Structures are given as structure tokens and as C-alpha cells.
């Protein structure tokens, strides 16, 4: 499918339907990873909007309102010619009956909210920097049944340099972690460093006990109830 999106395809439009002040955050987050032009829709200029969108290779339609019926004909026509992805930052109850508008869509993403965290997360999901496993809980008329949905895995690597950090400096953490195991300060550990919410360093070392041969892995779970006491 179209998701996660290829970031090297520069000719992308983000068509925003809803209050213009709401869409800047999603677009800014997306722009960190790929070229994309933001266009705020106006129902009084659909003809010129259609002509403008035709020059793009793909279109992301972000929806912040349930009142977008005026655009559905134009979007259906556009989706027949190029990949169109719908992203809803509105309540699920407002999209129950929108299935007909989605039949030609390359992808439909339900964010359910226009909060800042949700908009950033959805942008990251769309380029493979976060995973998504959610399923719809109700039927969307003529489109999807309850429990349906597509799992999206994280496919993009985080480069420290993209966040103002130096990989060569972070690599020295390996030596410190291994030295601690050698000195029997601990049998194993996982070191995770987040910068602006991005895991710029995430490595595992050693085992769970000195007698145990089971290695520490990124999928292991930890009880961090007393984390504040040790940091």
C-alpha cells in the first residue's frame, strides 16, 4: 500500500479541510521527513483547487471537520488519477457514514482527535517512524467492518544527526555498558536515549542474571515503578 510513505518522493500535497490554524502542526511534523506543500481548502474555489492538485504525485487529505461534503466529488475524481490518503483528526462518530468517499482512497487513517500529540504521532506513522496496530470498533458504511484495519510496522531508522546528536559520541555508550557487565555491576541492561521523542540510541547488552543465558532484548518488559528513586 501507500503507507508507510516513501520520503524520497518530493511532489506531495497536504490538503487541509477545516480550520487553517489546526493543520500547521501535522504539516510541520511531516516536513521533518519529506517534502510536502500545505494547501488549505476553500469550498468557493474547488475548480482552481482541483487544477492545482493535479500537478502533485500524491495527496494527503487532512480533515478537521465533519462538514466536507462539498469536496467529496472532487476528491473521488482526484483519487481515480493519483494516490490519495485521507487522515481524519475528528471524532469517529463523524466518519461512520463516509465509506463511499473512501472507496478509491489509497489509505484511510483515523486519528480521532486533533490534539498535538496525535497529530505528531500520525505524521510519524505515515512515514514509518512509528507503528500502528489499531482496529476500527464499528462498521463504516460500505467500507469496513468492526475489527478491521492494517498493522503498520516501524520501518525507518532514527539517525542521531537528524536530531542534533553525534553517532560517534553515542557509540561510546557501548564501551561503558560492556565495562559495567565485565565489572559485574549488572548482568545486562538496555540503554534507551530519546531526543524530542525519537529513539536515537536503543541497544541491549548482556543477560538477565549472571547464571541465565537469555539475552536482554528490546521486547523485554520492565517494572519501572521506582525509576524516580534511581535517577
Outline where the language-model segments fall.
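Residue-level signal for functionally critical sites in structured catalytic/ligand-binding pockets
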Residues: 133-135, 159-160, 180, 224, ...
Amino acid at each position: 500500500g501507500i503507507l508507510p510513505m516513501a520520503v524520497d518522493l518530493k511532489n506531495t500535497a497536504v490538503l487541509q479541510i477545516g480550520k487553517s490554524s489546526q493543520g500547521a502542526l501535522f504539516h510541520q511534523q511531516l516536513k521533518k521527513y519529506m517534502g510536502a506543500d500545505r494547501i488549505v481548502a476553500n469550498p468557493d474555489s474547488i475548480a482552481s483547487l482541483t487544477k492545482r492538485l493535479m500537478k502533485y504525485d500524491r495527496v494527503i487529505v487532512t480533515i478537521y471537520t465533519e462538514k466536507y461534503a462539498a469536496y467529496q466529488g472532487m476528491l473521488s475524481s482526484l483519487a481515480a488519477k493519483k494516490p490519495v490518503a485521507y487522515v481524519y483528526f475528528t471524532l469517529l462518530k463523524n466518519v461512520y457514514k463516509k465509506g463511499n468517499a473512501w472507496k478509491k482512497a489509497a489509505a484511510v487513517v483515523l486519528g480521532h482527535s486533533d490534539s498535538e500529540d496525535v497529530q505528531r504521532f500520525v505524521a510519524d506513522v505515515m512515514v514509518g517512524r512509528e507503528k500502528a496496530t489499531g482496529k476500527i470498533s464499528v462498521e463504516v458504511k460500505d467500507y469496513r467492518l468492526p475489527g478491521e484495519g492494517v498493522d503498520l510496522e516501524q520501518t525507518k531508522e532514527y539517525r542521531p544527526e537528524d536530531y542534533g546528536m553525534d553517532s560517534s559520541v553515542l557509540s561510546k555508550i557501548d564501551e561503558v555498558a560492556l565495562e559495567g557487565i565485565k565489572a559485574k555491576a549488572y548482568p545486562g541492561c538496555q540503554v534507551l536515549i530519546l531526543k524530542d521523542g525519537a529513539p536515537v540510541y536503543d541497544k541491549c547488552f548482556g543477560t538477565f542474571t549472571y547464571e541465565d543465558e537469555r539475552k536482554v532484548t528490546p521486547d523485554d518488559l520492565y517494572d519501572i515503578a521506582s525509576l524516580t528513586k534511581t535517577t
